[in-house]
Regions:
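Short, basic, glycine/proline-bearing loop/turn elements
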Residues: 339-347
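C-terminal "lid/loop" region of Rossmann-like NAD(P)-dependent oxidoreductases
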Residues: 214, 298, 405-412
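Short acidic/histidine-rich active-site segments
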Residues: 368-384
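Short glycine/serine/threonine/alanine-rich loop segments
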Residues: 321, 346, 368
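Short, flexible loop segments at the rims of nucleotide/cofactor-binding pockets, characterized by
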Residues: 191-192, 346-352
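Cysteine-centered catalytic environments shared across enzyme families
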Residues: 1-338, 356, 552, 557, ...
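A mobile, often basic/glycine-rich helix-loop segment
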Residues: 380-410
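Adenosyl-5′-phosphate
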Residues: 1, 7, 21, 115, ...
């Protein structure tokens, strides 16, 4: 895990001080060393910050060269199957000078070009310069675990880096993307327009999309292409639920094994939910000799009814884990809020990001560099509660015999009407229009018309009309008319997951930690997408096939746990803290000066207050 930087210039030669400025600002991503390289003609330069994970020697330093200097790489991430790829390349006569996954990636590209991406199991963002062909090849992993931002300067340069702030260090204008800001403030979401997924909160800065590569020529022409996608047509109706559970276990075990490869200490995040508990219990089972106890890291919230400590303790009691806890509170939040915003770079939807921040800080204090985490399961296994609505609608629309059984099971297992639209509900007083706004506002808004409406449904006085009038139109986003599988695809590959991965990358790298996500093995995700919907939602349960797969290694209370929380802090209580209220008021005044908030404004809810706070600090300070 590292930080990358680079410049391709068609005008003035690249200067080493430019590259150094770009790597110095992301020291946190790689405190173990840095490197800079400029080619002989001066039109290409790479920078790198190193966090040593695989092969701790200087032989693995970057930028790295291969093929008698023809190829040069700057790479951030991990190639988990590098040992298998290396063995295959050695059989073909390739020789290596290091034991790193970086050199394996570079050699594989030299051998296969763009096709190398098909063979990578990992998380990555990298750039390779081919001195013979004079092309810059850039690529990002399938789900977007690792970031890649880029911009074009006014003086004829293509500039890229892991983080947005690097680009500002070399002259890219820090100009706010007003439309993205409007969507965030007006619609309460951090999701970008799916028609323009490369957009960021800054006009001049773009992000390379997940599962895409980009070729840049010396005259700065670019060609972008998707190299991987989920096969929506593939569906296995022959497999039994037990065989599917067994295969799930096999693929997950293999994914965890690969993600345990490291030359530095490895631990796990533990929230007490099904996903993180599965990883901790699986590692415990794999660690048969128990020579080193698995360290787990968790956030607890004192005197909060949704604290998940009892579930964490069940996992700890059933394994040989060495638990460590942090207790985020409003005082810690006030103390670190500006730091969190500086690292996150763009607005984020709530203080749960801070809980993850505290977990990463704790891991650093315990000298554990790599953490396995459970992100990615919900998006493939229909883990969020609103998927019930999508699934039941699909069953009803198709006149499926499963509809009545699933509706009854849902009502028996959950609050009878929670999250269901009026056509399913016994409570006619509240429909999906009301319920799902609270349940899943980010996803729900994505498929609504992009039209002006109050952040909390009580008028538009909070935002300045001169600001909002620029964007008030009848323009619509694509309507969501598909079923469960289509919405799972949207969550994985269009919106939703990419934001969570952004938060995770910035939080972990702020403390020079590496987060690895076993549920995002593309082999596993492809398999899960081939399963019928009823293996994911069945008998009122989400993630049904997963519960079946791991019920023998998990505490029963977690396997068949109905509720889902996910590091939810006591936000309402925190927002009543005097220091936080002062921060909020200061932020609203700042946004008044920017012409974004109405001077006669009145915040109509906690979301208005939070959005003002995070926008002011991330974008205007």
């Amino acid at each position: 895990m590292c930080g990358i930087a680079g410049i391709l210039s068609k005008s003035n030669p690249v200067q080493v001080q430019e590259l150094k400025a770009m790597t110095d600002i992301i020291y946190h991503r790689g405190p173990d060393g840095d490197g800079h390289w400029i080619n002989e003609t001066g039109n290409v330069g790479f920078g790198h910050r190193r966090l040593s994970i695989i092969d701790l020697s200087n032989h693995a330093s970057q930028p790295m060269h291969f093929g008698n200097g023809r190829y040069t790489i700057t790479f951030n991430g991990e190639i988990y199957n590098y040992l298998e790829l290396r063995a295959s390349l050695v059989k073909e006569g390739v020789t290596f000078s290091s034991n790193s996954d970086t050199e394996v990636l570079l050699a594989l590209y030299a051998k296969k070009g763009v096709a190398c991406l098909e063979e990578l199991d990992g998380m990555f963002a990298f750039a390779i310069w081919d001195e013979l062909e004079k092309v810059l090849f850039c690529a990002r992993d399938r789900f977007g675990e690792k970031p890649f931002h880029y911009a074009f300067s006014n003086d004829g340069k293509f500039i890229f880096g892991s983080e947005i702030k690097q680009l500002f260090e070399v002259g890219i204008e820090r100009k706010i993307n007003q439309k993205i800001l409007y969507n965030f403030l007006q619609n309460h979401h951090v999701l970008h327009d799916p028609r323009n997924p490369e957009q960021t909160f800054y006009q001049k800065v773009q992000r390379l999309e997940p599962a895409h590569y980009m070729i840049v020529t010396p005259d700065l022409r670019i060609q972008k292409k998707r190299y991987w996608d989920l096969d929506m047509a593939r569906e296995n109706h022959e497999i039994s639920i037990q065989d599917a559970a067994d295969k799930f276990y096999e693929l997950m075990e293999q994914s965890v094994k690969l993600r345990l490869r490291s030359d530095v200490p490895v631990g796990s995040s533990l929230s007490g939910g099904l996903d993180s508990s599965t990883i901790v219990c699986l590692i415990d089972k794999l660690n048969t000799n128990q020579s080193i106890r698995q360290k787990t890291f968790s956030a607890r919230f004192k005197n909060f009814e949704r604290d998940e400590g009892k579930f964490m303790q069940m996992v700890i009691d059933s394994t040989n884990a060495d638990p460590h806890f942090t207790f985020p509170d409003e005082n810690k939040f006030v103390s670190d809020f500006k730091k969190v915003c500086w690292h996150q770079e763009e607005p984020f939807g709530g203080p749960s990001v801070f809980a993850q921040w505290e977990v990463m800080k704790l891991a650093k204090e315990q000298n554990v560099t790599v953490l396995l985490d459970g992100q990615g399961a919900d998006e493939s296994l229909a883990g969020y509660h609103y998927f019930f609505h999508t699934y039941l609608n699909e069953l009803k629309r198709n006149n499926s015999p499963l509809y009545e059984n699933e509706l009854t099971a849902y009502r028996n297992r959950h609050n009878p009407n929670y999250g269901l639209e009026q056509s399913h509900s016994t409570n006619k007083q509240k429909s999906i229009e009301d319920k799902l706004k609270d349940l899943v506002r980010p996803i729900y808004r994505t498929f609504r018309p992009l039209k002006p409406e109050s952040p909390s449904g009580q008028g538009t006085d909070f935002l300045n009309k001169e600001f909002t009038s620029q964007f008030e139109s009848n323009e619509k986003l694509p309507e969501h008319t598909g079923g469960l599988k289509e919405q799972l695809y949207v969550n994985n590959c269009v919106i939703g997951l990419n934001n969570l991965l952004r938060f995770a990358d910035r939080n972990s790298m702020a403390f020079s930690r590496e987060m690895r996500l076993p549920f995002l093995s593309h082999h596993l995700v492809e398999f899960l997408f081939s399963l019928p919907n009823e293996f994911k939602i069945q008998d009122g349960w989400t993630k049904f096939v997963m519960r079946k797969a791991f019920e023998t290694i998990l505490p029963k209370e977690i396997t068949w746990r109905v509720d889902k929380i996910g590091y939810e802090p006591p936000q309402s209580r925190w927002m009543e803290n005097k220091e936080i209220k002062d921060l909020i008021e200061s932020s609203i005044v700042d946004l008044e000066k920017e012409g974004i908030i109405n001077k006669k404004r009145k915040a109509t809810g906690k979301s208005d207050e939070w959005n003002s706070l995070v926008v002011s600090e991330t974008l205007f300070n």
